[in-house]
């Protein structure tokens, strides 16, 4: 077996040649990139890497999520990326994120250890919302950008500093819409009960109930 001790009598050139022939130290294996659908099946506490397009701007849901995270979606599914730092990301930026799967009061979230775990890859394709029935907002839609259309079935209710909520029903069952204060959407913008409204937003969950979180005033269309 070769050892450095036995090399003291070798010419320096021969020693360098011999050392250069030794195999390099093995590099740490790179974290495999999963589809978001695959990542969503991993147990809480699992470290994963995903790539996707930002679906909601950084900090849009800060009043109820208590962080500065953003939505992320690929062709397979979507999820929420939870961060304390506002990275000022907006759709349709494309990013790679490494983090740990966590349950945030029912909502599946990917939590990076630090902001450097979010790598900007350039612009991506804008996400087209998935049209769904109001009764179908649930686990199958969670993390995606969705759109519902129906009648405003109940008057808006204030949720204090968190924002406010209202309900839309297309006849299949009411969907809860939660509006965070950062979005710039106000209660006064909504029509009266019974009027038609279309809502686009991030399909979310809080505790046992599912909801849609609009991202900006453009996500609410009256009379459609």
What do the PLM-derived regions correspond to, one by one?
Residues 2, 20-23:
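Position-driven detector of the extreme protein N-terminus
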Residues 2-12:
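Bacterial N-terminal signal peptides that target proteins for export
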Residues 11-21:
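Bacterial N-terminal signal peptides
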Residues 28-224:
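OB-fold single-stranded nucleic acid-binding module
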